[in-house]
Amino acid sequence: MAKSPSNNAAQRVRKKVRKNVADGIAHVHASFNNTIITITDRQGNALSWASSGGQGFKGSRKSTPFAAQVASEVAGRAAIEQGIKNLDVEIKGPGPGRESSVRALGALGIRINSIADVTPVPHNGCRPQKRRRI
């Protein structure tokens, strides 16, 4: 005989843990196709994250500076709820959302201590892909 669904599944849902962290790091990964913003504490534990695609932008609109700005605002508001007041920003990648995402974080009232470019640069490592011809 089949059992009826119980309310145990509803009871197992965890409440969001509200951390009280004042300082953090904003990791901005700006590729040519998307922009992903992750806000962590000093140890690297993620507090909030957002991406351009996750905010409803699809296709070529994901890679616009406006989409990066919207994603930064969403991640920044969630981080402010966790208690973030100061951020160090680490930008990785060559995408168009680099600058607008940092400006959006500053406009939210978060104090930006430093901005660092941590784009990985090969010391002549792997052979690059062939040139794209259109």
Curated annotation (Swiss-Prot):
Listed GO CC annotations: ribonucleoprotein complex; ribosome
Entry superkingdom: Bacteria
Keyword Ribosomal protein included in the entry's annotation: yes
A molecular function GO annotation: rRNA binding
Protein name (database record): Small ribosomal subunit protein uS11
GO BP term, example: translation
InterPro entries: Ribosomal_uS11, Ribosomal_uS11_bac-type, Ribosomal_uS11_CS, Ribosomal_uS11_sf
Gene (UniProt): rpsK
Described function: Located on the platform of the 30S subunit, it bridges several disparate RNA helices of the 16S rRNA. Forms part of the Shine-Dalgarno cleft in the 70S ribosome.
Pfam families assigned to the protein according to its UniProt record, in alphabetical order: Ribosomal_S11
UniProt record similarity statement: Belongs to the universal ribosomal protein uS11 family.
Disulfide bond entries: none
Keywords from the named record: Ribonucleoprotein, Ribosomal protein, RNA-binding, rRNA-binding
Subunit text: Part of the 30S ribosomal subunit. Interacts with proteins S7 and S18. Binds to IF-3.
UniProt KW Transmembrane keyword: no
